[in-house]
Every structure is written in C-alpha cells, then in structure tokens.
C-alpha cells in the first residue's frame, strides 16, 4: 500500500475554510512521519483524514458522512467555522483502533466506538461499529468554534442526538437509539431527575457518576425539541444570548411558551411512547 493524497472538493457553498493550504501540507507531512503505509491520507476543507479502510470505503464515508454532516450543520445551526485542522483517523477494526490510539496518544481506556481529543485536534474512530459516533464527534468539533461556551448537557445532547441520524437535503435529523432504555429505566424506577435539574448541571457533574443517564436525558430532550421544531431556534437563541449567568430554563420556557414543569410533563409523556428496537 502507498499513501494516497487527494483533496475532496467541498460539496457546499455554505461554508468557506479559513485554513491555509500550506497548513494542510504541513499537517499531512507531519502525519506521514507518525503512521505507516497501511493508511491513505486525504484532505477536506477542515480535516485531514487518515484511514486504513479501503480507498472506496474512505471516500464513501468522506462524501456521505463527513461532507453531508458539514452541509447540514451550516444549513441548520452553525455560523462560525474552524480555524484549525482536525485530524480524523478512520480505523477498519477494533484491533488497529486500539493499537494506534496507544501508539500515538498513549490512550488505552477507550470507548469502543471512538473519541475526540479537542486539545490535540484529533478524532479516532472505530468505523467497524458504524459512523454514528463520527457524526457525534463532528458535532462537537464544529460546536466548539460556533458556541465555545456550550454547556456539557447541550453539547452532549446535540452530539448524541446525531449518533443515529439522516443527512438529507442539508438537513440533519436524529432518531431513537440505544440510549433510550437507560432513560426509560430511570423513569420507571423513579430515578428520573427533572429537566430543570439536568440543565443546571455543571460540566463536571454532568460527566460524573450518572453520566450515562445524563447523556440519555440530554439526548432525548434535544430530540423532543427537534420533534417540536424548536431545536434550531433554541440553539441559535441560546448561543446568541449566552453568558455565564445564562439560564437555559428561560430559553426553553420561551420557545415552548410553557413553564418548565409543563415542558417536563409533556417530555415524560412523550418519552414513554418511544420504542427502541435494538
């Protein structure tokens, strides 16, 4: 195998990369010194993609997942674009995913799906599990530039909403996924915490002992907003008006024209109607 270098043309006129071509060349040359020739390397307006899948598989993911996600994000949500390159590793199997995560970043306590390291501008994706986590992490990669202060509950709610999604006509839509049973279990066992408590969590608490439930709760709150056609409005108004004292509760009550208690009651009734066919 040899390195294949190609530039994927952006399919959208909605976004323009601020990143200089020379930065891509430098990033690719640096990457070549760290990985072997089982990888192909390609460039996208914001990413350098290193993949040990077949060139055809890599191109399909680049076109059908990465490029389409970018189109949807800028049509539906984001205005500001990244000013730095993120490297996306696409791994064909669990073995090579774990090997290179350890070799390159000394990471060994891994999600089986993949993960994003914002501080190092890199994503490592185990594509054998599907592309859902790729879209999740892409959401984070763009949100951190468009809405730098985004709180964890909303950042992870939005990202996890798109773990199972459609990308059609520059619109992204999330569907029921594997996180639903955890939320329904909490409701049935009277362990459910209110939306008001969820949106008041600081980031450390969100990612703490109850993170699996917090992710599920945030995901389905975002899906609930999506189903009521207010998610995009909430994102933009919350982003534009955000400061450290911003109260998501006020924004939710405004877009639903209901009290937070009424929203919670409607949300719980809706969640109970959902089914996950896992």
Which ranges hold each PLM region?
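Acidic/His/Gly-enriched intrinsically disordered linker/tail segments
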Residues: 100-125, 148-278
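Charge-dense, low-complexity intrinsically disordered segments
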Residues: 14-18, 52-60, 212, 254-257
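Proteins with a high burden of low-complexity, intrinsically disordered sequence enriched in S/T/G/P/A and R
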Residues: 1-13, 17, 26, 49, ...
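Juxtacatalytic substrate-recognition/specificity segment
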Residues: 36-151, 168, 244-251
């Amino acid at each position: 195998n040899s390195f294949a270098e190609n530039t994927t043309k952006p399919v959208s006129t909605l976004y323009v990369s601020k990143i200089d071509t020379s930065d891509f060349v430098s990033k690719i040359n640096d990457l070549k010194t760290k990985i072997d020739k089982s990888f192909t390397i390609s460039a996208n307006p914001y990413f350098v993609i290193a993949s040990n899948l077949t060139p055809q598989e890599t191109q399909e993911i680049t076109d059908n997942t990465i490029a389409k996600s970018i189109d949807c994000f800028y049509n539906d949500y984001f205005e500001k674009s990244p000013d730095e390159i993120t490297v996306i590793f696409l791994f064909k199997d669990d073995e090579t995913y774990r090997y290179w995560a350890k070799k390159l970043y000394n990471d060994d306590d891994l999600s089986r799906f993949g993960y994003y390291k914002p501080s190092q501008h890199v994503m490592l994706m185990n594509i054998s599990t599907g592309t859902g986590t790729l879209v999740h992490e892409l959401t984070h990669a763009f949100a951190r530039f468009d809405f730098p202060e985004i709180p964890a509950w909303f950042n992870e709610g939005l990202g996890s909403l798109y773990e199972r999604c459609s990308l059609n006509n520059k619109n992204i839509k999330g569907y029921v996924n594997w996180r639903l049973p955890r939320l329904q279990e909490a409701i049935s066992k009277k362990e459910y915490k209110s939306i008001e408590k969820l949106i008041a969590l600081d980031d450390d608490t969100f990612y703490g002992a109850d993170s699996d439930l917090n992710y599920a709760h945030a995901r389905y709150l975002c899906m609930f907003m999506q189903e009521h056609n207010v998610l995009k409005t909430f994102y933009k108004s919350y982003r534009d008006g955000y400061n450290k004292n911003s109260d998501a509760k006020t924004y939710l009550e405004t877009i639903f024209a209901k009290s937070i208690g009424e929203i919670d009651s409607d949300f719980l009734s809706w969640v109970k109607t959902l089914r996950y066919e896992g």
